[in-house]
């Protein structure tokens, strides 16, 4: 059973919040677009007109960041880079997750170019903005051909 305390939904048994997300990490796109490496097993991807996509993605990202901040959500923005080329970098939820006990989990990724998304700037932003007490790094499973994208 859950109860509402102010604007927070609380688990009546544990007294802990059911939803604690007031902060999100977003990657501001630079070269967002179709990813040949992930298209082989991602039904959501459709090849389209590539020319306008990076600019449109940046504009949409900026608008979304502004909307979130206007509604009280703290947005940690990591600027993407041109190199290495990471067309899916706007989806960092696939390579890491944070948990309310201070755990950071790093996940093994299928596509080699998705693994390049674990850029120092993104990892630094996570370390600086979340109280990381423990890290579970599952990325070594990539070497065994095992993948678990968050």
Predicted regions and their residues:
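The feature marks the mature, well-folded catalytic cores of soluble enzymes
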Residues: 1-150
